[in-house]
Design a protein with these regions (language model features):
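Extracellular beta-strand/beta-solenoid scaffold signature
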Residues: 1, 21-48, 64-72, 92-106, ...
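Right-handed parallel beta-helix
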Residues: 3-16, 51-64, 76-91, 100, ...
Length: 237
């Protein structure tokens, strides 16, 4: 078990070279295919139960990793403040849409605020999977290669005062796996210019979704799709 972990005031960069290239997009190209670095930024993976407790990430930049920028599992107490996790999560084994800027699984008491989760190449800005007692506040989640924020099987969560824009999928996706998420509040967010719905959710119970500003999400006038259906979503890659 590991307790009281603090990482702050660092830049963690996975790129191979830092000199200016002729093509400004060449670095992104090398992270998408067989030339990718296959590296993860920061990974804290618990074996069973809450193996970690009291994790704090502050003033931290994690960029240019082909795998997830930051991955945390089985933790009790996570604080992420004033961080920038950008350009992480590419098309590497085990495949696209499985690597993200930030992914947290099987954890509780999570506070994420005043941070950026932008431009994941093939993944989401932020993924919360099987988590309890969480809050995401005053964050920018933009221009990611899949959904902005993906949540699955979470309990007692708040998403407030965030900018969620320009993502290739939905701004917010509530995914159903076996029971669905419940007691989720999504309020006072600006959700705009996402390729699919602003908010889409399946099998979520006791939600409080209101006072969000929607603008030009998807191809339909409808900006939200909240379904009581309990079914898995199959994505076409």
């Amino acid at each position: 078990d590991a307790k009281n972990i603090t990482i702050e005031n660092l830049v963690v960069d996975g790129s191979k070279e830092h000199q200016d290239a002729y093509d400004p997009n060449s670095g992104r190209f090398y992270r998408t295919g067989r030339y990718s670095n296959a590296l993860a930024g920061i990974s804290m993976r618990g074996e069973a139960g809450h193996a970690f407790s009291n994790i704090k990430l502050k003033n931290l930049t994690v960029i240019n990793f082909s795998r997830s920028g930051v991955y945390i599992s089985d933790a009790e107490g996570i604080e992420i403040h004033h961080c920038d996790f950008t350009e992480n999560g590419a098309h590497v084994v085990p495949g696209p849409r499985l690597q993200h800027n930030l992914m947290i699984q099987h954890s509780s008491n999570i506070m994420i605020k005043d941070s950026r989760f932008d431009t994941s190449i093939r993944g989401c800005g932020l993924v919360l999977d099987h988590c309890k007692s969480l809050k995401v506040e005053n964050c920018e989640i933009a221009r990611n290669g899949w959904h902005g924020l993906l949540m699955a099987e979470c309990h007692n969560g708040k998403i407030e005062n965030c900018l969620v824009e320009g993502n290739d999928g939905c701004g917010f996706m509530g995914e159903y796996l076996h029971d669905g998420s419940n007691l989720i509040q999504i309020r006072h967010n600006k959700i705009q210019y996402n390729n699919e719905y602003g908010i889409r959710a399946f099998g979520m119970k006791e939600t409080d979704i209101k006072d969000n500003l929607y603008r030009w999400n998807g191809k339909e006038k409808r900006q939200e799709w909240l379904s009581s259906e309990k079914k898995l979503q199959l994505e076409q890659l």
